[in-house]
């Protein structure tokens, strides 16, 4: 290893999106390899609005592997981080940086220590798949740093070892994670069904009901469901295989009514499995249920689905509108039913693609107060408003997969390898 005595630092920075499953992954047949009991399908969300940025660095001056998440140092000793690190280090190749005059041999990677900094631009551990983006970015960035030859499909099998849903964040657009049949998990990988441009009419509105960490982690919840729920096996064997075929067809044909019905039904069944678990798991709350009711009433009044809803392991609603016009009508309804409290300003209550507010006809907080009730609310039923039940809304769309960022986007100091 050249320049052993010099304090050089080599860094790579990557950005990876999160994803939301429309056919859910819930339950593992192997806890160590993280092998699922069913296939799943997801939509990758635009990383301009929801993503993880990770900088990985290596230097002979580093004394130990260290990691910082959202500015706070965390332990890298966890099994999932270590599984990914071992897999990537075993596949590392020679690296040469001609500008810095640095050569790292394949055998040197085992000796060199790493510094890693990661930042989520959305709530961590609140049911917005932050672990998916985080572990996918961890693997993608390390693979680039260590000059791996593996493609994203092969990297997805490594990311899966860190977080199951992370394997789906290595692609943009619509992604399928195959459960596989091999005991060693070699065929349990993700691949892209269609890119983000395939169905670019879709608009996604996320209602962040709670940014707090959930009481029951996904890992614990899955274990409990597999041990105690009778519904989960029926779901995995009888229901999901048919829905996977139907969802693939709906995505290929851009058939929104079928897409919406499948997404809503699968979300509801996933949460039914959680309720069928002993002790029961409550990821959704009253606000989640109110949002479902709002969407269902609207869809029924029109006669065909305008919006799909799906909830991961948390109370936050991911609402998928068939086009921008419908998305504006959706946000209009959401702002009517879930107006902000007086502490909010519009700029922080609706984030992401704020241009949709122009379509809604809302320019300030007073405009929200004057919104009329949606037409599906009957005249004889008073319109209920739930002020403060939603923390904020994120407007986004299907997005691209992971990318490398220039050095200017690094989270670590290029001289010291410590957080900026």
UniProtKB/Swiss-Prot annotation:
Reaction(s) this enzyme catalyzes, per UniProt: (R)-5-diphosphomevalonate + ATP = isopentenyl diphosphate + ADP + phosphate + CO2
Localisation: Peroxisome
SUPFAM superfamilies per record: GHMP Kinase, C-terminal domain (SSF55060), Ribosomal protein S5 domain 2-like (SSF54211)
GO cellular component, one term: cytosol
GO molecular-function term, one example from the UniProt record: diphosphomevalonate decarboxylase activity
Pathway: Isoprenoid biosynthesis; isopentenyl diphosphate biosynthesis via mevalonate pathway; isopentenyl diphosphate from (R)-mevalonate: step 3/3
Assembly and oligomerization: Homodimer.
Annotated protein name in UniProt: Diphosphomevalonate decarboxylase 2
Protein species of origin: Panax ginseng (Korean ginseng)
């Amino acid at each position: 290893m050249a320049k052993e005595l010099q304090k050089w630092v080599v860094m790579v920075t990557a950005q990876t999106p999160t994803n939301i499953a429309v056919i859910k992954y819930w339950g593992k047949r192997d806890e160590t390899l993280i092998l699922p009991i069913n296939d799943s399908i997801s939509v990758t969300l635009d990383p301009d609005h929801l993503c993880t940025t990770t900088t990985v660095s290596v230097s002979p001056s580093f004394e130990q592997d260290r990691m910082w998440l959202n500015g706070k140092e965390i332990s890298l000793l966890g099994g999932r981080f270590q599984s990914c690190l071992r897999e990537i280090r075993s596949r590392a190749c020679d690296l040469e940086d001609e500008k810095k005059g640095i050569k790292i041999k394949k055998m040197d990677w085992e000796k060199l220590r790493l510094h890693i900094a990661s930042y989520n631009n959305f709530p961590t551990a609140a049911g917005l798949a932050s672990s998916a983006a985080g572990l996918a970015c961890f693997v993608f960035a390390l693979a680039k740093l260590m000059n791996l030859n593996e493609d994203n499909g092969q990297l997805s099998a490594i990311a899966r070892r860190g977080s199951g849903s992370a394997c789906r964040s290595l692609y943009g657009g619509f992604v399928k994670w195959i459960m596989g049949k091999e005991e060693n998990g070699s065929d349990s990988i993700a691949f892209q069904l269609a890119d983000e441009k395939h169905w670019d009419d879709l608009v996604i509105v996320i209602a962040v009901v709670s940014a707090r960490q959930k009481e029951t982690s996904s890992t614990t919840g899955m274990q409990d469901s597999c041990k105690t729920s009778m519904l989960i096996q029926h779901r995995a064997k009888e229901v999901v295989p048919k829905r996977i075929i139907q969802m693939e067809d709906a995505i290929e044909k851009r058939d929104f009514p079928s897409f919406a019905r499948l997404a809503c039904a699968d979300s509801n069944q996933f949460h039914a499995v959680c309720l069928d678990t002993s002790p029961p798991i409550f990821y959704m709350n009253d606000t989640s249920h109110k949002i479902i009711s709002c969407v269902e009433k609207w869809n029924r009044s029109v006669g065909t689905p305008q919006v799909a809803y799906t909830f991961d392991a948390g109370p936050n609603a991911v609402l998928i509108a068939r086009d921008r016009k419908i998305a504006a009508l959706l946000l209009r309804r959401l702002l009517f039913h879930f107006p902000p409290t007086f502490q909010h300003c519009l700029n922080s209550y609706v984030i992401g693609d704020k241009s949709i507010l122009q379509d809604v006809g809302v320019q300030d907080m007073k405009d929200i107060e004057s919104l009329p009730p949606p037409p599906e609310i009957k005249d004889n039923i008073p319109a209920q408003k739930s002020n403060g039940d939603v923390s904020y809304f994120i407007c986004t769309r299907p997005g691209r997969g992971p990318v490398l960022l220039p050095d200017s986007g690094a989270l670590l100091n290029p001289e010291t390898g410590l957080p900026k």
